[in-house]
Regions:
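Glycine-rich adenosyl-binding loop in Rossmann-like folds that engage adenosine-containing cofactors
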Residues: 1-41
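Conserved acidic-Pro-Pro-aromatic motif
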Residues: 34-136
């Protein structure tokens, strides 16, 4: 699968968005669920920051997440998701709430700590943030 990047900001590489990217290279993409079937291991915590590819990563890790219920820190970008489709951010939020009982908006550098009780709590976001998802 191609990944698009620019030398000045490798952290902004994207599988979904080619705009303003000067470099393209092929990368192997595997589902976490498939990897763990071949290499069994317990998962206690996950960090997902994949520049708009969150839904696909969550789908590829669904069995793992439902089985182990790892704590999750996920970058969440409603403005980016709205470029994909108007309901994309809601779909991700609903998936997270189907697994996790507690979701908190902790900001980019953990400068905030707000309980997220509904999707409407996320709708005012004008930039990306991190969500901390747990069951305790």
């Amino acid at each position: 699968m191609p990944i698009f990047s620019e030398a000045a900001n490798m952290g902004g590489s994207s599988i979904l968005f080619k705009k303003n990217k000067s470099r393209e290279q092929m990368v192997e993409v595997r589902k976490l669920d498939d990897f763990l079937q071949q290499h069994p291991s317990s998962i206690g915590m996950m960090k997902i920051d994949v520049e708009g590819f969150e839904w696909e990563v969550l789908q590829g890790a669904e069995q793992t997440m439902r089985t182990y219920k790892p704590k999750l820190l996920i970058e969440y970008s409603l403005p980016l998701y709205n470029q994909i489709s108007p309901d994309h951010g809601r779909k991700i939020y609903q998936f997270l709430t189907s697994i996790y009982g507690h979701i908190r908006n902790v900001g980019l550098d953990h400068e905030i700590d707000q309980k997220v009780e509904s999707f409407e709590d996320l709708e005012p976001l004008t930039h990306h943030t991190n969500l901390w998802c747990t069951n305790d």
